[in-house]
Amino acid sequence: MLEALSEEPAAPEDEGPLAAGDVDSLVAGLKRRYRTRITGEQVQPEAPGRYADLPPELEPRLAAALNARGVSRLYSHQREAWDHVRAGRHTVVVTPTASGKTLCYNLPVLHAALTEGAKALYLFPTKALSQDQVAELTELSQAGGLGVRAFTFDGDTPGDARKAVRTRADVVVTNPDMLHQGILPHHTRW
């Protein structure tokens, strides 16, 4: 009775195409199930990656950290972002999920932290994204012995830890709410 009244079809069972790992069958099943709700379909063909060399001016320890993590070259959009940022241009990068956007901003930030003592403030809308970014920065810093410190500064950061974040962080990762509630009203402490 509930399914008949529901807007959504029943959830797929834990067997069949998904359990078998057959993606084509899964997609075909979803298309059949949601045929009245699908208004269009577009398939984009696979495209080979385009690559570029690491920038020669990249701080050597940062280049070594990338190599330690298996990154010996950049995608062309990462290198293009590097070139624009280093030239002082405002830069927006729009690429698909999992295409390496993180390095587009982490490379210039880490390079500036290592060569100029620069600090950075990262804003993310969710705690999960913030934690992922801190983990990524920490792993890269540790891989190259960079000593760059990234910390989360959010509503769950204990009061005694907030001072440490303010004084020791090279990269502070927070969210818009915390920026307005906990950082801007106390900007003189930063």
Segments predicted by a language model, with ranges:
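Helicase-associated low-complexity/disordered flanking segments
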Residues: M1-E80, A87-H90, V148
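Conserved P-loop/Walker A NTP-binding site and adjacent catalytic elements of P-loop NTPases
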Residues: D53, E57-W190
